[in-house]
Structures are given as structure tokens and as C-alpha cells.
């Protein structure tokens, strides 16, 4: 401590002084060196050692090393001593030493140097590192076909004193890559002995494509060692490379890979590779070295049977390979083993999932039996879905237990399945062959068959199937002792004579596994036996009652026991016995002439084996006056009959039946029912729907048979096929009486339940009556349920009316066809009389009432319908002032417009009586077509309407004196009142005075003559003639009408009111007189007589 302090103080002082001044650099370096040496020497004296390291590779020896102290040569070490250890000092010349492993705990170690220096330190196992020796690779080989590296090395476990766990790391390098492509850890156990290890690694890159190097290191894990455990150094690299010895450029070749996996394929080429593809899919190129490239294929699908092509294209060539992708074999499923003959064992299985690999790459199956050591191989070049494979192995003598292992193997892997069986419990026999049948008697036969196999140690169970026509199959089990390749015999009894049987056989072991297949069928007819029963017999008396007819049924096959050849019939009474000659089959009827005595009839059937027991029946029939007749309806082809129990019946009941339409005696069939029965169901294929059958129930007593009940029935009711025939018995004005006949039983086809009668009004062949439907409201329907009724009166009808009548019968089976008729009811005379009298009485009453009313109202009727016509002279409306009418141009109503007359007539003689003419207004062209053609067209005018003209000749003395005749033309002006009829004594009155109102103008014949006397005279004789101013008329106007027959100028003028109407323009102002219709027509015109209209 003093030395250390001494060296420390100058150093501090020096630093302190350096803070105040700057010393020189050499002095500073010298001080530091001296300080370091002092501290190191002081530490050696105190036993403090730095950088001491100890390692071990086998936990037996520790290898310790340390650096030499400063100023001490490594060769000056004298010894090293370990305290508390025998022989603790070791002579040394270097700074490292190997010492035996120390016990756990701290140990003091002293190192002495020749120069007197000494170093001490504490050593513990925790400070020691366990570093194994560098491992050595024994061999590195390669399987280029599978791209697999095979590595071998030795763990040198004998160098370690204790068993330990070792961890190995293997790294694989691919040239030219420097980083490992694989780094794998492996665990082993060091047992204290040298042990070799091997490891296989498959490269994704084919080994041919690059140089591969392998190096390993290891780590020992000994739990009791408390020091550091470190990895060893990596072993030197071991290389593997491919020496090209083929022309192949693409690797791997014909590789089998797992479907869905990834793989790398490379191409070694001296020229540039352009592309790489699998199938039609191009993949990117991976450059390895030089021109060598590779492609990665991801998720490879299952390939076709021919594989998937991989192609590399270079500048001058194309290279390729084939890849087969599939699956490893599935575990064999449903593995089962059995034997057919205890000589060979057959194992079958289902391959499971299809691998997708075929040919030499398909799955190979190996069946190995571990007890006997026998094996068999199965190899199939194709795979089929749901196919069953099988292999056969020979059985060893006296070996029952067999342990089978089935291994499935293909290039992608292998699986296996195992099974243990007892062969005697897995016996599935072969199909029995050579089945034969041999007679023993009519009810027993012997069956024999051959069965291959060695069954001496087991019992067999065989099933015999017995089948006959129209019967259920019968199966019988037979147990027998097994034999070797033997024929087996079995007796089959309880058979029916003369019956065809079909036999077949199958067998199994007594410890049942499964049945064999059925043998071929064998048909066989048993021999005949005597009939077991006599025929079922019945008897009927003939219609005349003199002969007895015997009926019998053919015996069933199970009772005939053979082919019936003939029948023997005999009848016996207390007085005599009769036997008929032999009746050959198939006749089943015989007739015997007997009297009224009681006979017992006997019938015997005979076949080649003998005769049957006789069947007997009594001929006597006990009368019964109390017989009821009932109705019955069946279902399908059967009918049920019932009756009350009769204690007097001592033997069977007999029910016979026949078609109702057949004549007596009729017999279709019969059955016998035990005497304790009260009903039975009769079933027969001869029953037909819609046919009536008679059923007769006979009771049997010791004296004979008695008829107890008669039943009529149908198996099924149908609708009648004909309509009832009906006629009209009587007709009246309000009713019709119809009558119909019964329908024959054969055509009724069921029990008659009633009639439906339709009627309505209607004529024949009208659409309304062609078919009657009850849905129409005007159709009347009567349902007649009393089937005994055969007439019907229809009341409340109308007389002399046609009715449509329809009649239909019906059963439970439906409605029959309809029969229609048209009937007309008679006329009702009382109604006709009433129909005549009522209108006559009404007419008389109406006439009387009308006459009374007309008489009382006659004045009103006259005024309304036929009033008096007033005198025009008294009409003030027509009394015009002359001064007003003359010379006034403003009065256009009285102005005469020119009008073309339709007729002009010139009177040459004055002796002709006055003539009044009312003609139609026509065109002059139509009146005189001959003359109009010569007339100037300019003078022609068409008049659509002009009032008719009344011409009247008036004798004028003044005119006569002047030497000419004058003509006056009148225009008929229609009066508003009906003219009154004139008496015959008034016809001689002056024509001028009776001409009525005739407005006119009289023109002188000579216009130059102005004789006022003549005018005044004319006014007096002609009456009232309103006229225009004569002086203002232009008689020579071209528009004036002129006569074409003479040179005289005769002009006609229109009405003083209008030239286009016959009505007055100024109506009468008398309020009591009727008013004219403004439309030019009045009710009075209807009663007016106009000549020539």
C-alpha cells in the first residue's frame, strides 16, 4: 500500500503542477511508465492476476492460459501451485497449463516466476468454458438422382467421461453463394463410446446444377457442468460436385414430386438460354453461374399419365425433362382377409385416394404374414376409382392365427395397414356345385352337392331353399360335419306328392362369417300318391224332376296327389244301388235317373296310385215355405253373406250361386261352410260387375238339405245400359199421364233405386230441348223412389203447349240413359171462349162510353174538329183601300211579280160554260214538250213552284160588242177554313158568284180601249177582286207570261199577298176563328177536299 500510495502522490502532484504549468512531454511519458510498473509490481506481490482463461473439451482436463506480466519473459515461469491439492505444483516454462479438472468450489492458484515475482488468483468451475473439439466429417456422398446429400461423422463419445446430450449444427452451402442454403440442428446422446451419425438432406436445386459444401459443429450439454458451454469450431468444408458423364442438360430427369409442392429445375448450357416453361406456362429464369439457369415451379398440379413436360430453349437447341406429380399412397382401407377352402387366404382392400401416378411409378402393395414369414406382392399399372385389390397367400399346415401387414409404397412414400385373423372363423365357402335330387318316396327326397375345400376341423351349416308354385319359399338349415373335397347328402321330407319343387343350397361354417353364394336351382317333380280326399260334390234335380244331376269339383293338386284319371259315381237307397260307368277326367258331371226315393250319392276319384275316399251327398231336399229373399252388394270380386245360427243344422252349410238370367236348374259354383258359421265371404274369378247373381243357402241335416235363404246380389253395381220404355197414356189441357215398363235384369246392372222424370216446355229439335240439365230453372224434376210405380200424371200444365219429357232410371252405380218424348197438351175450350168474350165486352163498353161522351160534347167536338168556314167577304183583313194598293212602290207584298204560268188556255167560244181548273204547278217545258222545242230558249224559265190557276170564262157584253172575248185567270188562294158542301140546287148559281174568293186582275183585250163602263160592269159581276195598279204594269215586258196558242195577251197574276203560297199573309183577326199553322198546314186542311190532288 505504501508503494502504491507513493506512486500515486507524485502522479497527483504532477497533475496538479501540470494544471499550473506546462511540463515537457518526455518527462510526462517517463512518469506514466514508472507509475504503471509500480502498480503492476505491487499487484504481483499481492496475488492479483488478470486475463486468466480456462477451457475444457472433455471435462477431464482444464486448459488454462494467461498473459505474462509486464516486464516478465514468458520463459521465466518457474511453477504453478494449487492450494489444497496433492501434487499441487507443476513445473512450467510457458504461460499456459493443463491441469486436471478441479472439484467444484474456489481454488487458489499461485504462479511463481524466476525473477521472484509471484501471481495469485482464485479458480472456479464456473469460470471454465466447455468447448468441444472441432468435429470431423467422415464422408459426404450424393445421390444425384434424388438430389440427396448423405453426411457421416463420429461423435467421439469415448473422450467424455459422462453421458451427455449433444446438439449438432449442419450448414450447407451452394457455390457461388456464401450464405448457407440450409442450417439444420440435430440432437444426439453421447454414450461414452464413439458412435457414428448420418444425415440426409434433399436439395431443392438439383445437385448437378451447383457445387454443394457441408460443414458441422457441435455443442455439449452436460447438466452437472456449471461452467460456460460453447459451440465448437466449424469443421472444414466438405465439397460435393457433379462430374458430367451424360448428354443430359436438364436436371432432374423424370422427377416424381408431390402434387402441390414447389421444385427447381436447372439447365446446364454453354450457350445462352432464352426461356423455360412447364407445359404451356413460361417461368422466369434464375441465373446460377455462367450460362446455367434454373426455373422455380410453384404448386405443381397432378400431372397426366404421361407427365408434364419442362422445356428450355437456347439459341441453337431445345432441352427438356418430364415431371410426374402425384400423391403418396393412402393407407389401405377396409383390409379384410378370409378363406374359401382353408387352403389359401385371400386379403382384399380398397386403395383409398388415387395417387395420380401410373406405370412404374404406381403404388406397389406387399402383403406380409409375420408368423409364417410368407409374403406376396401386388403391382397395378393403372388406377381405378373404388376398385378392390386382393392378394392370395398359401396357408401353412395347422396354422389358424395369421398376422398380416399390408404395405403400400410409391416414389413419394409408403403407408401400411395390419390385421390379425383366425382362419377358421373367416371361412366363406365356395358355391356348392353338382346339386342332385333323388326320390325316397312321394314325400321325401335326397339332395346332394359337392363342396371343394379342407373342412375336416370345422362343422358346416347349409341352407336348403324349397319353393313350389303359388307358395311361399321355405328355408331349412342343416348342420353337418365337414370333410375334405367331399360330396354332402341331406334328406328333405314333408313334401307333397306329385308337386314340382325347386331346390337350391348355400353353406357357411358353424362359426358364421358369411354365406356362400346360392347354388344353381334344381327343379324336381315328386311321385304320385293316392288322393287324400274325395271330390267336393253337389246335386240338382232336373227341371222335370225325373233325373238327379251330380256335380263335383276337380280335386286341388295338394289333395289329388297325382293326375286324376277317372271318377266312379254310384247311388244307393234302401231298395237299390246304381253304379255308373267310369267317367273320365275332365268331365265333372253325371246324370242319374231315379225315382223319388232317398238316395245317397257317392263319388270316388282315381289316379295311378289308387282311389280317393268316397264323397257322399243325400238327394233328399227338405221343403221350406218360409224363405226370405235379400239383397247384397259385394266389393271387388267378393261378396259377404250372413245368416242366423241354426242349431238344427248338423253338417255343413252349402251356398250355391248362378247367374240370374240362366234357366233352372242353374249352377255356376258352390262352396261348403262349417255348420258353426254364421257368415262367409264368397270370392270367385267368375264374378263380373253389373251381373246379378242368385245365392242359395242350404242347411244340412241327417235327412237331407233344406233351402234356408235366397239372396240376389251384385259384385258391383253399374248404371243401367238402357232407358225405360215409356208412353203417354192420356193428355188433357193441363196434365199428361205417362206409363213405363220395367227394365230387363240383364240391362239394369244393379238394384233399381228409382226414376228421374224431367219435363219442360219446348219444341222438337230446338237447341233448348236437345238436352235437359237440372241447373236450368225452367226444368221440372220429379224423383220417383217407389220402384213399383209405373205411371205418373204431370199436372198444372198449359193447354195447347209442347212439352219435352225425359225419363231415366238409376241405381247405386249411376244414372242410365235417357228416353225423351215431345207431347202437346190439348186446347182449353173454356179459356178460348173467355179469351173471345173478354175483348168483345171491352170493345162494347168502350164504344158505349165513347158515344155518350161524344153526344154530350158534340158542340165542342164540332168547334174543335170541324168548325164553320167564315165568308171571305166579311173578312176585314182583305178589305184593302184602292188608294193604298195603287201606285205605292213601298207595298211590296201586294206587288205582282212575274210568274211563268204552267198552263195557258185561250177560249174561242163564249158558249162554253165556265170552267174552273186547279192544276199542279209544272214547268211549261213539261206541259208541252212539242211546242217548247220551237220556243226561243231565252223566253223559257223554270219555275220551281207556282200556285194552281183557276181559269174562268166570263161573258162580257161590252167586250162582245167590241168584237173580242176577254179571259180572266184566277189563282186559287187556299182558304184557312174547310169549304162547305154545296147543295145540288145551288149548282145553277152564277159561276162568278160561287167561285169563292178569287183575287184577280182583269185586263182588257184591247189595251187601247178605255171603256170605263165595261170595267164597272165587270166589277159588279165579278165580286171583290183586289188588284194592283193596272197602269203601272208593263204588258209587253219580256217577263210577262204570254199564251203561245194565240196572239191575245193574257196575263196571270199571283196572290195579292204572295206568289209562292196558298195561305194568307194576313191572318184573320177574329179570335173565335181557328188559327192557321205557321208552317203552311193546319188541322182543317186534313179534312179539305181538293180536286185533282
From Swiss-Prot:
Span of domain Fibronectin type-III:
45-127, 331-428, 431-530, 534-625, 623-715, 720-829
Biased segments, Polar residues type:
1028-1063, 1082-1093
Please name the SUPFAM superfamilies in this protein's record.
Fibronectin type III
Gene3D superfamilies linked: Immunoglobulins
Q: Which UniProt keywords apply?
A: Cell membrane, Disulfide bond, Glycoprotein, Membrane, Phosphoprotein, Receptor, Repeat, Signal, Transmembrane, Transmembrane helix
- Protein family membership: Belongs to the type I cytokine receptor family. Type 2 subfamily.
Q: Summarize subunit and interaction data from the UniProt record for this chain.
A: Heterodimer composed of LIFR and IL6ST. The heterodimer formed by LIFR and IL6ST interacts with the complex formed by CNTF and CNTFR.
Q: In its UniProt entry, what is this protein called?
A: Leukemia inhibitory factor receptor
The gene designation is: Lifr
Amino acid at each position: 500500500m505504501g508503494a502504491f500510495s507513493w506512486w500515486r502522490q507524485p502522479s497527483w502532484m504532477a497533475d496538479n503542477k501540470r494544471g499550473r504549468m506546462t511540463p515537457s512531454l518526455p518527462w510526462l511519458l517517463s512518469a506514466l511508465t514508472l507509475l504503471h510498473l509500480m502498480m503492476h509490481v505491487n499487484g504481483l506481490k499481492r496475488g492479483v492476476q488478470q486475463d486468466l482463461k480456462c477451457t475444457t473439451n472433455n471435462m477431464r482436463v482444464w486448459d488454462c492460459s494467461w498473459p505474462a506480466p509486464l516486464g516478465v519473459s514468458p520463459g521465466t515461469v518457474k511453477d504453478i501451485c494449487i492450494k489444497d491439492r496433492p501434487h499441487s505444483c507443476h513445473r512450467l516454462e510457458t504461460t499456459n497449463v493443463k491441469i486436471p479438472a478441479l472439484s467444484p468450489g474456489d481454488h487458489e492458484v499461485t504462479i511463481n516466476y524466476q525473477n521472484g515475482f509471484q501471481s495469485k488468483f482464485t479458480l472456479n468451475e464456473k469460470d471454465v468454458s466447455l468447448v468441444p473439439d472441432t468435429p470431423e466429417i467422415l464422408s459426404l456422398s450424393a445421390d444425384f438422382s434424388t438430389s440427396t446429400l448423405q453426411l457421416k461423422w463420429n461423435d467421439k463419445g469415448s473422450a467424455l467421461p459422462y453421458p451427455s446430450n449433444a446438439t449438432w449444427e449442419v450448414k450447407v452451402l451452394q457455390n457461388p453463394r456464401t450464405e448457407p442454403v440450409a442450417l439444420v440442428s440435430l440432437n444426439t446422446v453421447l454414450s461414452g463410446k464413439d458412435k457414428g451419425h448420418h444425415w440426409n438432406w434433399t436439395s431443392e436445386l438439383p445437385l448437378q446444377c451447383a457445387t454443394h459444401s457441408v460443414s458441422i459443429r457441435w455443442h455439449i450439454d452436460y447438466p452437472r457442468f456449471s461452467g460456460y458451454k460453447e459451440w465448437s469450431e466449424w469443421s472444414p468444408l466438405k465439397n460435393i460436385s457433379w462430374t458430367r458423364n451424360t448428354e443430359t442438360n436438364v436436371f432432374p430427369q423424370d422427377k416424381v414430386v408431390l402434387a402441390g409442392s414447389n421444385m427447381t429445375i436447372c439447365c446446364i448450357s454453354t450457350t445462352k438460354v432464352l426461356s423455360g416453361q412447364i407445359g404451356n406456362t413460361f417461368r422466369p429464369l434464375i441465373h446460377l453461374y455462367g450460362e446455367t439457369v434454373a426455373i422455380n415451379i410453384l404448386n405443381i398440379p397432378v400431372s397426366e399419365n404421361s407427365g408434364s413436360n419442362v422445356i428450355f430453349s437456347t439459341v441453337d437447341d431445345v432441352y427438356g425433362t418430364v415431371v410426374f406429380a402425384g400423391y403418396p399412397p393412402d393407407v389401405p382401407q377396409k383390409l379384410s382377409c378370409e378363406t374359401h377352402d382353408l387352403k389359401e387366404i385371400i386379403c382384399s382392400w380398397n386403395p383409398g385416394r388415387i395417387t395420380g401416378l401410373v406405370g412404374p411409378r404406381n403404388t406397389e402393395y406387399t402383403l406380409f404374414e409375420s408368423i409364417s414369414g410368407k409374403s406376396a406382392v401386388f403391382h397395378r399399372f393403372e388406377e381405378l376409382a373404388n376398385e378392390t385389390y386382393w392378394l392370395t397367400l398359401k396357408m401353412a399346415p395347422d396354422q389358424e392365427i395369421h398376422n398380416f401387414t399390408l404395405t403400400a409404397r410409391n416414389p413419394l412414400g409408403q403407408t401400411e395397414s395390419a390385421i390379425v385373423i383366425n382362419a377358421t372363423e373367416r371361412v366363406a365357402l365356395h358355391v356348392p356345385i353338382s346339386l342332385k335330387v333323388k326320390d325316397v318316396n312321394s314325400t321325401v327326397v335326397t339332395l346332394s352337392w359337392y363342396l371343394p375345400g379342407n373342412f375336416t376341423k370345422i362343422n358346416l351349416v347349409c341352407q336348403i331353399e324349397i319353393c313350389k308354385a303359388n307358395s311361399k319359399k321355405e328355408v331349412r338349415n342343416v348342420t353337418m360335419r365337414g370333410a375334405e373335397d367331399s360330396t354332402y347328402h341331406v334328406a328333405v321330407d314333408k313334401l307333397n306328392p306329385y308337386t314340382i319343387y325347386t331346390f337350391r343350397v348355400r353353406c357357411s361354417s358353424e362359426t358364421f362369417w358369411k354365406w356362400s353364394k346360392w347354388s344353381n336351382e334344381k327343379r324336381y317333380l315328386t311321385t304320385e300318391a293316392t288322393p287324400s280326399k274325395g271330390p267336393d260334390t253337389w246335386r240338382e234335380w232336373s227341371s222335370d224332376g225325373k233325373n238327379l244331376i251330380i256335380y263335383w269339383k276337380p280335386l286341388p293338386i295338394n289333395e289329388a296327389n297325382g293326375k286324376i284319371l277317372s271318377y266312379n259315381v254310384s247311388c244307393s237307397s234302401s231298395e237299390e244301388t246304381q253304379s255308373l260307368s267310369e267317367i273320365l277326367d275332365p268331365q265333372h258331371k253325371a246324370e242319374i235317373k231315379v225315382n223319388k226315393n232317398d238316395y245317397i250319392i257317392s263319388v270316388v276319384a282315381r289316379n295311378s296310385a289308387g282311389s280317393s275316399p268316397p264323397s257322399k251327398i243325400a238327394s233328399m231336399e227338405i221343403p221350406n215355405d218360409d224363405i226370405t229373399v235379400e239383397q247384397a252388394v259385394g266389393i271387388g270380386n267378393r261378396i259377404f253373406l250372413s245368416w242366423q245360427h241354426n242349431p238344427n243344422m248338423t253338417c255343413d252349410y252349402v251356398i250355391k250361386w248362378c247367374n240370374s238370367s240362366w234357366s233352372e236348374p242353374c249352377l255356376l259354383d258352390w262352396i261348403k261352410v262349417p255348420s258353426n258359421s254364421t257368415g262367409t265371404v264368397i270370392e270367385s274369378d267368375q264374378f263380373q260387375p253389373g251381373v246379378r247373381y242368385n245365392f242359395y243357402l242350404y242347411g244340412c241335416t241327417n235327412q237331407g238339405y233344406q233351402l234356408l235363404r235366397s239372396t240376389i246380389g251384385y259384385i258391383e253395381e253399374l248404371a243401367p245400359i238402357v232407358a225405360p220404355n215409356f208412353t203417354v197414356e192420356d193428355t188433357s189441357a193441363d196434365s199428361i199421364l205417362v206409363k213405363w215398363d220395367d227394365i230387363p235384369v240383364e240391362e239394369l246392372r244393379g238394384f233399381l233405386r228409382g226414376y228421374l222424370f224431367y219435363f219442360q216446355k219446348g219444341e222438337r229439335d230446338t237447341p233448348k230441348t236437345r238436352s235437359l240439365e237440372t241447373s236450368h230453372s225452367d226444368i221440372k224434376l220429379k224423383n220417383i223412389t217407389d220402384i213399383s210405380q209405373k205411371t205418373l200424371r204431370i199436372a198444372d200444365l198449359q193447354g195447347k203447349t209442347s212439352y219435352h219429357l225425359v225419363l231415366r232410371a238409376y241405381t247405386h252405380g249411376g244414372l242410365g240413359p235417357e228416353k225423351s218424348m215431345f207431347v202437346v197438351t190439348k186446347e182449353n175450350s173454356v179459356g178460348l171462349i173467355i179469351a173471345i168474350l173478354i175483348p168483345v165486352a171491352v170493345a162494347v163498353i168502350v164504344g158505349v162510353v165513347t158515344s155518350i161522351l161524344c153526344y154530350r160534347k158534340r158542340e165542342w167536338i164540332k168547334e174543335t174538329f170541324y168548325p164553320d168556314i167564315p165568308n171571305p167577304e166579311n173578312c176585314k183583313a182583305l178589305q184593302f183601300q184602292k188608294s193604298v194598293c195603287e201606285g205605292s212602290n213601298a207595298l211590296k207584298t201586294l206587288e205582282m211579280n212575274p210568274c211563268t204560268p204552267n198552263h195557258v188556255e185561250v177560249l174561242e167560244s163564249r158558249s162554253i160554260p165556265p170552267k174552273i181548273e186547279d192544276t199542279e204547278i209544272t214547268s211549261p217545258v213539261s206541259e208541252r214538250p212539242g211546242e217548247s222545242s220551237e220556243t226561243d230558249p231565252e223566253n223559257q224559265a223554270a219555275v220551281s213552284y207556282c200556285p194552281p190557276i183557276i181559269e174562268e170564262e166570263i161573258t162580257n157584253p161590252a167586250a162582245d160588242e167590241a168584237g173580242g172575248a176577254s179571259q180572266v185567270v184566277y189563282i186559287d188562294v187556299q182558304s184557312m177554313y174547310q169549304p162547305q158542301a154545296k147543295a145540288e140546287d145551288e149548282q145553277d148559281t152564277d159561276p162568278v158568284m160561287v167561285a169563292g174568293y178569287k183575287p184577280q186582275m182583269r185586263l182588257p183585250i184591247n189595251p187601247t180601249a178605255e171603256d170605263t163602263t165595261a170595267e164597272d160592269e165587270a166589277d159588279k159581276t165579278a165580286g171583290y177582286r183586289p188588284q194592283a195598279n193596272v197602269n203601272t204594269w208593263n204588258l209587253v215586258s219580256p217577263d210577262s207570261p204570254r199564251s203561245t196558242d194565240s196572239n191575245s195577251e193574257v196575263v196571270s197574276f199571283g196572290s195579292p199577298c204572295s206568289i209562292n203560297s196558298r195561305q194568307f199573309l194576313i191572318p184573320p183577326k177574329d179570335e173565335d176563328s181557328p188559327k192557321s199553322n205557321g208552317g203552311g198546314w193546319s188541322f182543317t186542311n186534313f179534312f179539305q177536299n181538293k180536286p185533282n190532288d
